[in-house]
Regions:
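Beta-sheet-rich non-transmembrane sensory/scaffold domains
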Residues: 1-350
Length: 350
């Protein structure tokens, strides 16, 4: 199963996963990683500690000699099934979920960085584990060789402690001679928050902020230049975060949202314009336009409710067609309602 594909010069870079399968006897098996029916050498398979999902993630490069044939050049495999793969230039970042630690089930993500050089050779250069889970591909960005991530962190921790026990009256004498009676009690601690990370080219942490939004998870997120825009679930608000100082990401502005937002779109040619796709409280599709500049308030300038009630575009950004114009944009996507499948085309002009 292919996760991500990128063309770089005359090279094609593909990241794919090999997942476990169940045979006719109900036995779960995992095939050895292979390219064109040839198994990879042991030196080409990497292992990251605390991997959660069995399987393999393959990073392969091919030379495009012509339009009819691909020549394998480099390949490496990582033990574990990737949740997300992010490609930027020559770098490939594989994100895998890691297992919970003893008495600490905080969600964590293992990141492995692969570099594809000019000849197509693939090499693993760094690995790191951070707290949290990336919900979508847009929550990851490489900027100036550094990796930025916006994570939903669910922290859960349990531990056993000896505590003073309340004993009945007829046990008092026993307690007097044996010492204070105690009981082994379990304690649990659970919380959620949004964290933003900045990692250097060796995946070491430059800065992190776990104070972006407590008690929340990320619904959608987008990086543009040195600014992050994210929408959180429960409180329904959009937050603007500055990444200018990587060591200390700062919240610049936020706006309360009336409706659910599932998708954010930013325009590199016009950073002040943002539009979102989501659903109203009555279940109808909704398109909202915002204006924002770094360090100023985010303003909602228009909102359009559609008669349609569902769209694959809410979960898959590849189903959205956007064309920027001088003062606005065209937006097209597939929708569903009682009348069946439809393809509305919206035109917004500022």
């Amino acid at each position: 199963q292919n996760l991500c594909t990128r063309v770089s010069g005359e090279k094609l870079i593909i990241a794919s996963v090999m997942q476990p399968y169940t045979d006719a006897d109900g036995v779960i098996s995992i095939e050895d990683p292979q390219i064109n029916d040839k198994k990879l050498a042991v030196k080409d398979v990497y292992w990251q500690r605390d991997l959660y999902q069995p399987g393999y993630t393959l990073v392969c490069s091919y030379r495009m000699a012509d339009h009819t044939q691909l020549e394998p050049v480099g390949h490496k495999a990582l033990a574990g099934t990737a949740m997300k793969v992010y490609m930027s230039g020559k770098n490939v970042y594989v994100l895998c979920r890691t297992v919970a630690k003893r008495f600490d089930e905080t969600e964590r993500t293992g990141i492995t960085k692969f570099v594809v050089d000019s000849e197509g050779t693939v090499k693993a250069t760094a690995t790191h584990i951070v707290k949290g889970i990336v919900g979508e591909g847009f929550a990851v960005k490489e900027q100036g060789g550094h990796l930025w991530l916006c994570m939903s962190v669910h922290h859960y921790k349990s531990e056993w402690k000896w505590k003073k026990a309340e004993v009945p009256f007829n046990w008092k004498l026993l307690a007097h001679y044996t010492g204070q009676l105690k009981m082994l009690c379990g304690e649990e601690e659970s919380s959620r928050n949004v964290s933003v990370y900045a990692l250097d080219d060796s995946l070491q942490e430059i800065g992190t902020s776990s104070e972006i939004c407590k008690g929340e998870t990320v619904q959608c997120a987008r990086f543009l230049n040195k600014t992050l825009y994210l929408v959180v679930n429960d409180d329904r608000k959009m937050i603007q975060v500055s990444m200018a100082a990587e060591a200390d990401p700062q919240v610049l502005a936020q706006i309360k949202l009336a409706d659910e937002v599932h998708y954010l779109h930013l325009f590199p040619s016009d950073p002040s314009m943002i539009f979102s796709l989501g659903k109203t409280t009555t279940g109808e599709l909704d398109m909202t336009v915002f204006w924002a500049t770094e360090g100023s308030d985010i303003k909602q300038v228009a909102s359009y409710g559609l008669r349609q009630h569902d769209s694959s575009a809410l979960a898959d950004h590849t189903k959205i067609l956007v064309q920027k114009t001088e003062k606005g944009f065209y937006l097209g996507f597939a929708t569903y309602n009682a009348e069946g499948l439809q393809y509305p085309l919206l035109h917004y002009t500022a």
